[in-house]
From Swiss-Prot:
This is tRNA 5-methylaminomethyl-2-thiouridine biosynthesis bifunctional protein MnmC. SUPFAM superfamilies: FAD/NAD(P)-binding domain (SSF51905). Residues 1-20 are annotated as: Disordered. GO terms for cellular component: cytoplasm. GO terms for molecular function: flavin adenine dinucleotide binding; oxidoreductase activity, acting on the CH-NH group of donors; tRNA (5-methylaminomethyl-2-thiouridylate)(34)-methyltransferase activity. It comes from Polaromonas naphthalenivorans (strain CJ2). It is found in: Cytoplasm.
Amino acid sequence: MSERIEWLEDGTAGGSPYSPRFGDRYRSELGGLEQAREVFLKGCGLPNAWAGQPQWCVLETGFGLGLNFLVTWAAWKADPLRPRLLHFVSTEAYPASADDVLRSALTHPELIPFAEQLKRQLWGLLPGVHRLVFEGGQVLLTLCIGDTKAMLREPSFEADSVYLDGFSPQRNPDIWDVHTFKAVARCCRRGTRIATWTIARSVRDALAQCGFVVKKVPGTPPKRDNLQGEYQPAWEVKKSRITPERKAPARCIVIGAGLAGSAVAASLARRGWQVTVLDAASTPAAGASGLPAGVLAPHVSPDDSLLSRLSRSGIRAMLQQADALLQTNIDWSPTGVLEHCVEHARQLPAAWHPGQALADAAGDWTRPATSEQLKHCGLSPETPALWHVQAGWIKPARLVQAWLSSPGVSWHGNAAVSQLVRQAGAWQALDATGNELASAELVVLAAGHGSRALSEIASPQAGRPLALQAIRGQASWGLHAPGTEQAMPAFPVNGHGSLVPRVPLEQGLAWVTGSSFERDNTSPQLRPEDEQHNFGKLKTLLPAAAQALTAQFESGQVRGWTGVRCATPSRLPALGPLENAQDVWVCSGMGSRGLTFAALCAELLAARLHGEPLPVELRQADALLPQYATRLQPSGS
């Protein structure tokens, strides 16, 4: 449930927000806008401090109603000398509703357009890290839902500015104690500026104890003083606390022009890199990413496993990209997806059940399917099924094309890489005859199951190879005949194979079902037995839809598509720097969840490369490191 807020009449458009939990107002009598500008922006020397910088990172303790973020975003947009990238990281233990966030901004008309954009993305805020994207990926809001001390325990970034906000120290002492400030200090570099509205002695003493040099400065009437300072500890900062050096944008070779490679290329290009994408095929998305249409839906599990949590982060990232780059109802559609739990009734986490604390936020993601939704599928009301709200279908190839069209990205087909040679601080990608295809300071291996061989070329001293396994899949599809469309639901269904019922193609309206799953097979040939396998699965998944398509399957009118996926034993992607190979990274192993993970992994790679805030928790990101994809040797290798 969202945090309860009371709105006190004060003569303004929205009223004054008040927290019953803490018995305190969300903003001072000055108004939130003036406090944000005078206390936080001015207190941290913004916008002057970020002028001409490639990126800037603000850390805030206490997101509240988002006013400080909105004011900072507006200042960034109005500044001709703004940094290319603005990161805003904010912690919040008790997130407010999207409606209350918008209502809070109504008092300030200049902020309403920003608040409306923010409101559209404030959904599904379960505990953990949520990345919200604005301005075409140039303004990145990382919301850390949970206790500030816990969320900042393992920092992955260095803040340039810190806003210390929250209810008064008397009302909410935990966010102002020395343990919180130690967590904040772990995210700071020498010279990081901090600002806050409180000058309480306990706050000043705790900050000083954590390495901050602070001073009182004149406030805006009726506030007499504010507090400003810098992180200047008298001791040497331990190396274990120093985040990776922010790598300057340069040249990058991405090997592979599927979902993984094209997503990486676009993310790096947004940060100023010149990216060359090489692929052995003559067209982009020629491999597993060439599926006519794929289902985008989160994974759920009773214990809310690592895979489940990562899948939600991936879905959010992909929805943002699809909405920004693709044509709705032509290239993709956020229809929602019904999961028919054929083999067993998939259980939701106990904390998601109705009446529990997380029920509202979880319901933005997944909830039990309704009898009406089941009826549309031709299934009985007793059928075990889930409804994924934030889900739909996408044409992967169209997304690949959009990413490869990003400024700064150059794609080259018929460019099979046979050798990677490092000379004079750069990598050369060579073809089979030894001709140079491209050279760059950074290489990203995103060639599906081909990434394993490339990793062995780049790092011949590696102990064990990446356990990337080839998995052949065959999907079946066809154009709707008279009467078949009416027999199908308006949304995709998955759970035992999948069906995307309505995909607009140049030839007409199509359906797509599948797919088969065969390990260690890379054959591109279509096989009749796989077509029948897909039909058999569809009969179980959606009997009514299968019945409507029987004539097409029996008369040979069904078409086929085949591709080779790449997976790891953990079913998680392999993402990160390759061991024993300087400036070679891996982004592969997404299996059948390329649509789920491609956008997230690309942003995670870019964040780790530049020392930026991560779009997921650090321990989740670490679970994807390539060394963990060497633990099991794939069969048949």
